[in-house]
């Protein structure tokens, strides 16, 4: 463990994020933010609507009178814009691609990232998905420096997050953001006061890379031999992926979402993985019972 000592008056921070979150609001309320960059790589209809209407980062920047830049793809040159703002530290949360070295190495104090897992576990783009997949109930957040690798930089600090059985994705995400906001603020304060830890990560991760999951791969990932409790928990955490199985029409899938309801431990003769309906509603036949689901109108707060 090493301690790096810097003394910076009025630390200037630049934020890179694609989420209007507790993390963003905490930084805006407590630190000197000199710029916000919003990377927007996802071109799906629901994502565009969500970002443009429900989670408009540009409007937040305008409210706080902070310079804003939309980063439309990973090839866009953002270094000149960053140079003009001259931040001491860049803070990243929810970034769809890796930053170039010329960017993350520009600030005098470097660039830190908030990752929703206890590194070196679940390095990659979607750690929360894989937390559900591996039925991992003990997770957390990591604030780490960005280097050339994917989530491999030195760790500043970590905080634990407990996953409740059957907790939905958006509920767990809210937990991550609450604890993550505390963690990122603590990390910045430590860096600002010259008391930040830099803990080297192990080269190898105990888990496979937390890759993005496409429709076809999600279907392949479902292990119908899992017991009912595990598959129900997995479905509750991946409702947005389940719609690719349960809603065949692509346009309809943009309007509706899936909400997983209760599970029922019961014997049956249905084919495992098949869809049915009884007096209690629609259900998926699983090993050892049924998992009920409903169609709900799309809601960006439950995405």
What are these regions (language model features)?
Residues 1-242, 246, 275-302:
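One-carbon transfer enzymes
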Residues 235, 239, 259-264:
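Short leucine-rich amphipathic alpha-helical surface patches
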Residues 247-261:
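Short, structured protein-protein interaction patches enriched in aromatics and acidic/basic residues
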Residues 264-277:
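A conserved acidic, glycine/proline-rich C-terminal tail/linker
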């Amino acid at each position: 463990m090493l301690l790096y000592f810097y003394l910076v008056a009025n630390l200037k921070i630049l934020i890179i994020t694609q989420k209007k979150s507790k993390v963003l609001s905490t930084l805006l309320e407590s630190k000197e933010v000199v710029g916000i960059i919003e990377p927007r790589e996802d071109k799906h209809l629901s994502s565009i609507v969500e970002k443009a209407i429900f989670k408009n980062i540009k409007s937040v920047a305008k409210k706080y009178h902070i310079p804003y830049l939309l980063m439309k793809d990973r090839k866009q040159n953002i270094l000149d814009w960053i140079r003009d703002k001259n931040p001491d530290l860049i803070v990243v949360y929810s970034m769809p691609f890796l930053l170039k070295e010329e960017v993350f190495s520009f600030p005098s104090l470097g660039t830190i990232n908030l990752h929703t897992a206890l590194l070196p576990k679940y390095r990659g783009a979607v750690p929360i998905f894989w937390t559900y997949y591996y039925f991992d109930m003990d997770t957390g957040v990591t604030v780490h420096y960005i280097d050339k690798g994917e989530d491999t930089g030195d760790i500043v600090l970590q905080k634990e997050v407990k996953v409740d059985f059957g907790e939905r994705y958006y509920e767990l995400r809210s937990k991550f953001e609450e604890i993550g906001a505390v963690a990122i603020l603590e990390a910045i304060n430590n860096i600002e006061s010259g008391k930040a830890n830099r803990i080297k990560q192990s080269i190898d991760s105990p888990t496979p890379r937390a890759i993005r999951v496409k429709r076809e791969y999600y279907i392949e990932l479902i292990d119908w031999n899992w017991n009912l409790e595990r598959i129900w928990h997995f479905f509750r955490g991946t409702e947005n992926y389940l719609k690719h199985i349960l809603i065949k029409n692509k346009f309809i899938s943009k309007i509706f979402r899936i909400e997983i309801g209760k599970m029922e431990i019961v014997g049956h003769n249905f084919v495992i993985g098949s869809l049915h309906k009884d007096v209690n509603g629609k259900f998926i036949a699983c090993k050892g019972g049924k998992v009920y689901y409903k169609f709900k109108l799309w809601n960006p707060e439950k995405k």
